[in-house]
A protein has these predicted regions:
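Short substrate-entry loop that stabilizes the transition state in hydrolases
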Residues: 149-153
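C-terminal motif of bacterial Sec signal peptides marking the signal peptidase cleavage site
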Residues: 25-28
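Lipolytic serine-hydrolase domain surface
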Residues: 34-117, 124-126, 131-134, 154-158, ...
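Alpha/beta-hydrolase fold active-site loops
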Residues: 138
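A hydrophobic membrane-anchoring feature enriched in long, contiguous, low-charge segments
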Residues: 364-433
Length: 433
């Protein structure tokens, strides 16, 4: 497969044999079926149930069992979802057991028991019902990161709530992510699109007499959305709502300078901030180098080095450095939710009210990320060329390959000399041409 990139160089992709070897190496990345949110009839003895209230700026999906898509919705929507988690004897804390086929088996898989769409009044009523069952009346709001479909966010949050064992009312705020590694720009703008909505959700929760305390947990790009929403609230109202006591910033994909500005604008009465960082976070390295951000990412700083050490101490920000923590995540971007020890720590801190990836990525997606270089378009095109044979083998890559092509095509636009023949890449790669 020869790819002309208009830069005077040719490049030949590995053939199917190498692709098969790589696919075997990352076999755990095999895709999962669409439609996992279609409810199953019943669960099994020993399984756990997690009830999640959802507020979303996503557009309703056209396909049954998906509920909401990666497109932007015209207004804030609400849902109430119950997830069944298989018995502890068949799963390790920190993991999500995705069904390989539908319907999923509640004895071994995460499955959906109920998925109701609600209006705002119904959502308020169900919040009241859930807080009545929780003695502490504490709400945990989770805001996911980049490259998350709706079902990714739902099942990951269910895993976090279950594994932390925290007695909280779970509220998921999910924004329109397309669930594609090449839709970074779209996802970033979707967080900006969702700022007012998240601010409104947090304000209404804080004004609800049934709620005593709110903790916000953000991951990756979701941190930008959380910081911007809290910053807006402080500017509008003079301070962040007092019931928002704790904000956990896990692997924040946020420029350090912008984070400083948000901390300052939140004022001295801001919530307690806890920061999870890791210097080996490869996803944040990609964010910095490929997508045009030259500044340091907050989630990848060394908290023991200056000027960060002094700044964090001065701002009274608690830091947990996860660099040495082991993770099954090849990108080291979801350590906060994937390590049993860290999940237990987070649960204890939430229970005590103290300060303290995740997304599924296929083999082809990983190659796209790993080929990233100084020239984003060239790196992306090369990554897709390598990914082409893998897309025939690895289900997750095959599922997202077409989305990658569309996103790349939009990014190339009128770029002169871009002569990548993407439409026939998989067939040509398998034939060795």
């Amino acid at each position: 497969l020869d790819v002309g990139l208009g830069v005077g160089s040719g490049w030949r992709a590995p053939r199917a044999g190498l692709a098969l070897a790589l696919a075997a190496w990352l076999g755990a990345c095999a895709g999962t079926p669409r439609g996992v949110l279609a409810p199953v009839a019943a669960t099994v003895p020993g399984a756990s149930r997690v009830d999640i209230l959802v507020a979303t700026t996503r557009k309703e999906a056209a396909t049954a069992g998906e509920m909401y898509s990666g497109e932007r919705g015209p207004a804030l929507a609400y849902a109430d979802i119950t997830v069944s988690i298989p018995p502890d004897a068949v799963r390790a804390p920190g993991t999500v057991q995705w069904p390989r086929s539908l319907p999923g088996d509640p004895a071994t898989d995460f499955v959906t028991l109920r998925a109701d769409t609600l209006d705002r009044m119904e959502a308020t009523s169900r919040l009241r019902r859930q807080t009545a069952r929780s003695g502490r009346r504490q709400v945990l709001v989770f805001v996911h990161g980049f490259n998350n479909r709706f079902e990714d966010a739902v099942y990951r949050f269910a895993q976090i709530v279950h594994d932390t064992r925290a007695e909280v009312v779970p509220v998921l705020f999910t924004w329109p992510s397309r669930g594609s590694v090449l839709a970074y720009g779209y996802d970033r703008e979707s967080t900006n699109y969702s700022r007012n909505a998240l601010e409104g959700v947090l304000r209404r929760l804080a004004r609800n007499p049934e709620v005593d305390e709110i903790t916000v947990l953000a991951h990756s790009m979701g941190n930008w959305l959380v910081l911007e929403s809290l910053r807006q609230m402080a500017i509008r109202d003079g301070r962040v709502a007092g019931k928002i006591r704790n904000v956990v910033l896990a692997a924040p994909d946020v420029d350090v300078d912008l984070a400083r500005e948000a901390f300052r604008d939140m004022g001295p009465g801001r919530p307690k901030l806890s920061l999870f960082v890791s210097q080996d976070d490869n996803a944040l390295a990609v964010s910095r180098l490929v997508w045009g951000s030259g500044g340091a990412r907050l989630g990848a700083i060394d908290p023991g080095a200056e000027p960060y050490r002094s700044e964090l101490a001065r701002e009274n920000i608690a830091v947990l450095n996860l660099t040495d923590a082991k993770s099954d995540d090849a990108l080291n971007h979801g350590k906060f939710a994937g390590s049993p020890q860290l999940v237990a720590l987070l649960g204890r801190r939430l229970a005590q009210g103290q300060t303290v990836t995740d997304s599924r990525v296929g083999l082809g997606d990983r190659i796209v990320q790993m080929t990233a270089g100084a020239a984003a378009t060239v790196g992306t095109a090369a990554g897709l060329a390598v990914s082409a044979p893998v897309a025939v083998i690895d289900a997750q890559s095959r599922e997202t390959y077409g989305e990658h092509l569309r996103n790349l095509g939009q990014g190339l636009g009128d770029t002169a000399g871009a002569t990548v023949d993407l439409a026939t890449a998989p067939a040509r790669a398998l034939s060795g041409r």
